Structures are given as C-alpha cells and as structure tokens.
C-alpha cells in the first residue's frame, strides 16, 4: 500500500543518493590522483555546490513537484495531473522547450562539443563488462529510430583518411622544456651569485665593524689603564701632601689647639678618591684663608689701638 508522499520520498532519496555518489566520486578521484584531502572539507564544498546547482537550476523543485503530482494521482486527485498534461501539450510550452534546447545546443557548441560529438553521444552508449577490459557499444532509441527512417548510411568502401588525432611533438616539447629549464637555471644562478655577493659584502662589513669595535675596546682599555694610573698618582700625591703638611705643622710654634684643629682637618681629607680629596683641600684652604683674615683684622685693630700704622713692602 503506497503512502500519500511515497513518490516524493523516493525522489528526495534519489537526490540525496546522487549527492552521496558525487562525494564518493570526488574523494575516489582525489585518491587515484594521489592528492591528500580533508573529507569534511570535500563534503562541505560538494554539498554547497550540489545544493546551489540543484536549487538554482530548478531541477530539485521540478523532480519533487512531479513526484507530488504522482502522489496526488495515486490518492485520487487528478487536478494537478490534468494541469500538467495541458501545460505539456500547450504550443507555447513546446516553443519554450524548443527554445531551451536550442540554447543548450549553442552552449555545448561554445564549450567545444560540436554536432558530431552530440549526435554520437545521443546515438550510442558504452556498456562495461564486469571483470573484462572490453566493453559493449549499445545503440540508443534515437539510433534505432534513425535506422528505421533510413537516416543511417553504411560506407563499405575503403577510404584512407588521415585521422584527426592530436599528435604531440615530444621533441619540440622536450626542447621547450629544456630551454625553460636552462632559463630557470640561469635565473637561479644569477640570484644565487647576487646573494653570495651580498653575503660577502655583509661579512666584510661585519668584519670591519668588529675591527672598529675591537679598536674602540682597546682604546677604552688604554683609557681605563691611564685613568687608573692617574688616579693612583693623585692618591699618592694627596697622601704625600697630607704627610708633608703634617710634618711641617709639627715644626711650627703654633698653639697645640691650633695644631690639633689643623691635623683634624688634614685627617678628614679623602686620600682614596682624588675628587673628594680636592674638595677637602679646597675646604681646608678656605678655612686657613678665613683664619688668616681674622688674624689680620685682629692685628690691624691692635695696631690702631697702639697708634701704629702698617704698610706692605
């Protein structure tokens, strides 16, 4: 007992099976060609293209629509069947179908499929024999109709005709490939030579830069040695200066408090860092000048109190 939509389900199943067959054909072809592929990507691409072609061409809707018409007829509803019958026998429909056929023929011709190829494909088909390399050529109904109409001629005469076979001049092809290879080889050699020259120049610049850096490092080392020696000399000079002043101070007839104060200032001089030592010496000299100035003022005041005058000679 057929269901209400059994024909539509069968048509939908055929469409889905066609899609699966397209996926299998695509993947098997890639495997035979030795091309690695992603099955999910192939499945997605084929499905997208298949759905677009079936929907855009109207084939899917046409098949499902005819299946729906058959289901309606099986369920006793012949209205859609009669409309389709009237549409198929209408002169405008026939003219439209004839126009579509002509368009398809012109499209095939533009793709290089000429009339001979179209007629032969329409008149013959090839049946493969399982397990054998040979095959059987079958005549289609169109070929049978042509034979019945006398539209088929058999030429028994032997006519030697040159077969229109696309021959390949392998020697010229080989020469062409050899020239391309030599040209490519020359370009590669030129690029390699240019790269080698650039690499040599880079190496020369690098060696030159290394020499400059080495010279600068040597100069820096010499300056560091000179600075170290100069610093040591200054330390010795400062130490000698402090010792000489201390010795000289002890030979003076100054009060012990003054000697002690000056010795403390001498001992506070940094003999390790010449820069700090110079600052300490500056402070010591300033203090001595200040003390000398105070002593001079006291002496000047004392002379005035004694009604004496002073003069430098």
Curated annotation (Swiss-Prot):
It holds the Pfam family Rota_NSP3. Gene3D superfamilies: 3.30.70.1610, Nonstructural RNA-binding protein, Rotavirus non-structural protein NSP3, N-terminal domain. GO terms for molecular function: RNA binding. It is found in: Host cytoplasm. Keywords: Coiled coil, Host cytoplasm, Host-virus interaction, RNA-binding, Translation regulation. The keyword Coiled coil applies. Residues 1-149 are annotated as: RNA-binding. Residues 208-313 are annotated as: Interaction with host EIF4G1. One of its GO terms (cellular component) is host cell cytoplasm. Homodimer. Interacts (via the coiled-coil region) with host ZC3H7B (via LD motif). Interacts with host EIF4G1. Belongs to the rotavirus NSP3 family. This is Non-structural protein 3. It comes from Rotavirus A (strain RVA/Cow/United Kingdom/UK/1975/G6P7[5]).
């Amino acid at each position: 007992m057929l269901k209400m939509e059994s024909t539509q389900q069968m048509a939908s199943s055929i469409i889905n099976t066609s899609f699966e067959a397209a996926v299998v054909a695509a993947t098997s072809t890639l495997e035979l060609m030795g091309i690695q592929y992603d099955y999910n990507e192939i499945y997605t691409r084929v499905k997208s293209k298949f759905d677009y072609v079936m929907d855009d061409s109207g084939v899917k809707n046409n098949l499902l629509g005819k299946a729906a018409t058959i289901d309606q007829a099986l369920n006793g509803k012949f209205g859609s069947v009669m409309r389709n019958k009237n549409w198929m026998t209408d002169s405008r429909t026939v003219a439209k179908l004839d126009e579509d056929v002509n368009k398809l023929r012109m499209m095939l011709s533009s793709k290089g499929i000429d009339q001979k190829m179209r007629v032969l494909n329409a008149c013959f088909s090839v049946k493969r024999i399982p397990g054998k390399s040979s095959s059987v050529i079958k005549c289609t109904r169109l070929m049978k109709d042509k034979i019945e109409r006398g539209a088929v001629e058999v030429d028994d005469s032997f006519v030697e005709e040159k077969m229109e076979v696309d021959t390949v001049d392998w020697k010229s092809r080989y020469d062409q490939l050899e020239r391309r290879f030599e040209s490519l080889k020359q370009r590669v050699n030129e690029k390699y030579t240019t790269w080698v020259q650039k690499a040599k120049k880079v190496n020369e610049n690098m060696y030159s830069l290394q020499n400059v850096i080495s010279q600068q490092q040597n100069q820096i080392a010499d300056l560091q040695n000179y600075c170290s020696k100069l610093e040591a000399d200054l330390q010795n000079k400062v130490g000698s200066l402090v010792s000489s002043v201390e010795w000289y101070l002890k030979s003076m007839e100054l009060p012990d408090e003054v000697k002690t104060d000056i010795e403390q200032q001498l001992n506070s001089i940094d003999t390790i860092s010449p820069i700090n030592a110079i600052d300490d010496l500056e402070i010591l000299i300033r203090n001595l000048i200040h003390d000398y100035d105070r002593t001079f003022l006291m002496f000047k005041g004392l002379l005035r109190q004694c009604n004496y005058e002073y003069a430098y000679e």
